[in-house]
Amino acid sequence: MSVAAKDSGTAVTDEGATSDVKMTPKDEELLAQEEKKASSSDDVETEENVYAAALLSSSADPAAYQEKYITSRVELWSYYVYYIGNQGLGPFNYGPSQLQNLLTLAAEAAGNGTCGGTGQAECRLRWAGSARTVESLVLLANGIGFAIQVALFLFIGSLADFGSYRPWILVLFTVVGAATCMAWFGVTDPAQWQVAMGLYIMNNITYQGALSFYSAAFPGLVRGLPEVRDSAEKLSAKPAQTTAEEHARIESLQRNRVVNISFGIQAAGEIVILAVIQGVLSGIHADQDAAHNTRALSVCAGIGGATWLLFALPWFFLEKHRPGQKLPKGYNYLTVAWLQLRLACKHIWKLKQTLLYLIFYFLLSDTLNTAITVISTLQNDAAAFSATVLNELLIVGIVSETIGIFGLWYIQKWFGVSTLNAFRWVIFCIVVLMVWGFIGIFTQKFGYHNQWEFWVYQFWYGGLVCPWYAISFTMIGEVTPAGYEFLIFSLFGLIGKSSSFVGPFVSSAISNRTGNPSAPFYFLLFCTLASCLLLIPLDLQKSRIEQARFLDRAKEEKERAAAGGAGFGLEGSLGEKDDAVVRVRSVGTDAAKTEPRTIPGSEGDSNSTPHRTKE
């Protein structure tokens, strides 16, 4: 066998002999192809090694290989059952409706017949030094709740991922949240509207807090499943008994299975609870008069809190308290959150497509959440705050959500619809939602002003818009490098929470200034269309290339760290050079050298995860 030496124009044999044979253009072309193939093979092997190491080190979970933390069937089912109670009936549905009802009755009483009628101005209540409309007060309370969350999570958010306090923080949020929901039992007088605002703000904070710390248990729960543990052990063996790609596929399938079952059980449980509430409303004669209806709304919110606590108890007693990540040296629970933010911001600039999606997510998530609040205030007015009608609308919405989320997931799975195309369809449905509200600014004939529109809205929102909560997070996974989910998801989580108070505050000001409850759609439609423009240059193929380059740079930094270099870069989850990371790094060097890497979910997207999150 001989190797051509292009520069000298001669052929060199294995024995070192040379000949005067000149290389033809065809020979040069063949040589270039061979060199390219060899380089490509090396790149694939290197990328696969980095990928394997990233998969094993991404959790940085010291409990990953301890037998006592294997996820049992009983523990898994207690996790499912918790979600039945934490569905938001009290803090997310009936609490806001009762707040708006009490505000409306109090404002009408204060106006004494001079407002709220045909041709009259909107009734207002004085709060925080200004006379404000009812819709403005609801949005303001919503914004205050989210603003407090941002401040709170900047200081305690790290407890969800570090140390062993996460389960106890979840218990605290759940107990306080359920208690403040049940406090609605005693708030039935319009004169208590200020107390109602306080309860609503507390409901908002505790519900979102509980949801965050409950969700933080999910990765460890999945990694503890016997199937995932077995696959991880095979990948870490020397030589590896499986490929990194196969391990990623198994973990993804188990993650999707847990989420799907969780959502299905939650939806079925919520429908049963709503059916029970419907019976209670009939028994207490909710439709008899305004006083009975007001009491009924408080009963509904209180039942939501009671079921939340009841269904949380199994998880409190059966959860295996898996320790979280270790704090980096020199950091505590207060300062590590800023480290997370700094590292995530540092890395995001190297991932242009990820940054593009982050800006899009910032705009649309806040806009959609605010729009839902605005539409809910309009729905309450159209339904005349009838607890019975609102409960029936909610049943329709939950059924539609179940059909919509699972329907889109199966369409993707069986027809090979890509994540990006499915995502674009959901965005189109969101735009229609905003346009319909925008029309309502100028006419009372339609645009969320009639009761029939809200039956259609529940079908549309549940079936076509709610998949946003699943597919938007699937998209985050599409633009996140393997092994760095922790940092990137923490950044998206912080952005989601920090942006969530902007929309309510702006919309509250618009509604209060104009006296038109539909006026916020000026702002909401503009933000929606502006965010859609960012989807035009979004390219998932470019994102995969950026991720591969990012992982290659990460490998180089890990090697420098192993040799005693700087420790706070791309290496590890937070740059710690502990024995576990070194062990994983050595494992990754031998893992899966035979198959080229593909990005999970890039082959038609069987990894889309249906999941609903109320924000």
Sequence positions of predicted segments:
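A late C-terminal transmembrane helix in Major Facilitator Superfamily
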Residues: 483-513
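Short amphipathic helix-loop junctions that connect adjacent transmembrane helices
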Residues: 93-135, 373-391
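Transmembrane alpha-helix termini and helix-breaking/packing motifs in multi-pass membrane transporters
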Residues: 99-101, 157-158, 270-294, 409-414, ...
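Intracellular helix-loop hinge segments at the cytoplasmic ends of transmembrane helices
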Residues: 213-221, 377, 470-479
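Helix-to-loop junctions at the C-terminal end of transmembrane segments
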Residues: 149-165, 403-424, 441, 511
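Intracellular loop-helix junctions on the cytosolic face of multi-pass helical membrane proteins
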Residues: 2-75, 185, 195, 209-361, ...
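C-terminal ends and interior cores of transmembrane alpha-helices
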Residues: 171-191, 428-447
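C-terminal transmembrane helical hairpin of 12-TM major facilitator-type secondary transporters
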Residues: 421-470
